[in-house]
Curated annotation (Swiss-Prot):
<keyword id="KW-0675">Receptor</keyword>
<feature type="transmembrane region" description="Helical; Name=3">
    <location>
        <begin position="114"/>
        <end position="135"/>
    </location>
</feature>
<feature type="compositionally biased region" description="Polar residues">
    <location>
        <begin position="1"/>
        <end position="21"/>
    </location>
</feature>
<protein>
    <recommendedName>
        <fullName>Vasopressin V2 receptor</fullName>
    </recommendedName>
</protein>
<feature type="topological domain" description="Cytoplasmic">
    <location>
        <begin position="220"/>
        <end position="270"/>
    </location>
</feature>
<feature type="lipid moiety-binding region" description="S-palmitoyl cysteine">
    <location>
        <position position="340"/>
    </location>
</feature>
<feature type="transmembrane region" description="Helical; Name=5">
    <location>
        <begin position="200"/>
        <end position="219"/>
    </location>
</feature>
<keyword id="KW-0807">Transducer</keyword>
<feature type="region of interest" description="Disordered">
    <location>
        <begin position="347"/>
        <end position="370"/>
    </location>
</feature>
<keyword id="KW-0449">Lipoprotein</keyword>
<feature type="transmembrane region" description="Helical; Name=4">
    <location>
        <begin position="160"/>
        <end position="180"/>
    </location>
</feature>
<dbReference type="GO" id="GO:0010628">
    <property type="term" value="P:positive regulation of gene expression"/>
</dbReference>
<comment type="similarity">
    <text>Belongs to the G-protein coupled receptor 1 family. Vasopressin/oxytocin receptor subfamily.</text>
</comment>
<feature type="transmembrane region" description="Helical; Name=7">
    <location>
        <begin position="308"/>
        <end position="327"/>
    </location>
</feature>
<dbReference type="GO" id="GO:0001992">
    <property type="term" value="P:regulation of systemic arterial blood pressure by vasopressin"/>
</dbReference>
<keyword id="KW-0812">Transmembrane</keyword>
<feature type="transmembrane region" description="Helical; Name=6">
    <location>
        <begin position="271"/>
        <end position="292"/>
    </location>
</feature>
Length: 370
């Protein structure tokens, strides 16, 4: 079975091919709705510029920050998240933009397979880097001694490597599903997928939805809840800890510390809500229409709202850099400096613990032995 679409910026295709019959390639190209095609190009162009510009700015701020000292652990994750989102822009949105402009994939079979593989790598990496970042913050807050032993400052760490490794591994089926194939015997070649009838497409789309959206969303939400519980527990009554011992369950020792803890808790709640809500809002419409199209033969695959929603696979890549930058005072200051073109000397880079504020728990991170 061949499933194809020239209107979906996703690593698989759900719409039925443009009717070929015995017409020429030129006749096939004119079968598209010109207004819808223009809307697709405009939307993809906007998304590409937004993703590339947003992540480029944040990555530039990180590089500039790193020149004055080693990266904090959170900087490492944000940097790799920016790289993953830039991969989405370069390997998913940009090829699809060129594809939509010509209506057919223009390139050899090897390029077809490579583009489809890299499109999926970007989707996986963007989601898994957020999950890895959240898991690391959970370890830093709930297991500070373990986090301290691993240290920081390097541009790579185990969660980052695992996120990239799983992204590269889980994307491998794309190399075998897609190829340059003849469009319904018309003589026109396009980059098409072949799925087993009738369950292949449904199984694959459902698997992608689970692995890219559902599982990471549940993991992110669970980690944020555990982080919040850890912070909340630190406010409760408990024995005064021994010197150098854990501080779980102890009250703040001064009004100033209490105010700092309360602010951290409030920031944690905001961070949790922003991460989970934005993640779900960005991915849910896209995967809902994909699952609908895969499971319902009568789905309105060619309707404008349906088609345009299928183009929003990379929407989360537009929001990622701003969410995490807004909760990092160091990155925010660098961004303001870049955007305002004020290249004045910034304050010295804090240690690796500074970026625990990204989970609104700087007060706990400071309990980590140094």
């Amino acid at each position: 079975m061949f499933m194809a679409s020239t209107t979906s910026a996703v690593p698989w295709h759900l719409s039925q091919p443009t009717p070929a019959g015995n017409g020429s390639e030129g006749e096939l190209l004119t079968a598209r709705d010109p207004l819808l095609a223009q809307a697709e190009l405009a939307l993809l162009s906007t998304v590409f510029v937004a993703v590339a510009l947003s992540n480029g700015l944040v990555l530039g701020a990180l590089v500039r920050r790193g020149r004055r000292g080693r990266w904090a652990p959170m900087h490492v994750f944000i940097g790799h998240l920016c790289l993953a989102d830039l991969a989405v822009a370069l390997f998913q949105v940009l090829p699809q933009l060129a594809w939509d402009a010509t209506d057919r994939f223009r390139g050899p079979d090897a390029l077809c397979r490579a583009v489809k593989y890299l499109q999926m790598v970007g989707m996986y990496a963007s989601s898994y880097m957020i999950l890895a970042m959240t898991l690391d913050r959970h370890r830093a807050i709930c297991r500070p001694m373990l986090a301290h032993r691993h240290g920081g400052g390097t541009h790579w760490n185990r969660p980052v490597l695992l996120a990239w490794a799983f992204s590269l591994l889980f994307s491998l089926p794309q190399l075998f599903i897609f190829a340059q194939r003849d469009v319904d015997g018309s003589g026109v070649l396009d980059c098409w997928a072949r799925f087993a009838e009738p369950w292949g497409l449904r199984a694959y789309v459902t698997w992608i939805a689970l692995m890219v959206f559902v599982a990471p969303a549940l993991g992110i939400a669970a980690c944020q809840v555990l982080i919040f519980r850890e912070i909340h527990a630190s406010l409760g009554p408990g024995p005064v800890p021994r010197a150098g011992g854990p501080r779980r369950g102890c009250r703040p020792g001064s009004p100033a510390e209490g105010a700092r803890v309360s602010a951290a808790v409030a920031k944690t709640v905001k961070m949790t809500l922003v991460i989970v809500i934005v993640y779900v809002l960005c991915w849910a419409p896209f995967f809902l229409v994909q699952l609908w199209a895969a499971w319902d033969p009568e789905a309105p695959r060619e309707g404008p709202p349906f088609v345009l929603l299928m183009l929003l696979a990379s929407l989360n890549s537009c929001t990622n850099p701003w969410i995490y930058a807004s909760f990092s005072s160091s990155i925010s200051s660098e961004l303001r400096s870049l955007l305002c073109c004020t290249w004045r000397r910034a304050p010295p880079s804090p240690g690796p613990q500074e970026e625990s504020c990204a989970t609104a728990s700087s007060f706990l991170a400071k309990d980590t032995p140094s």
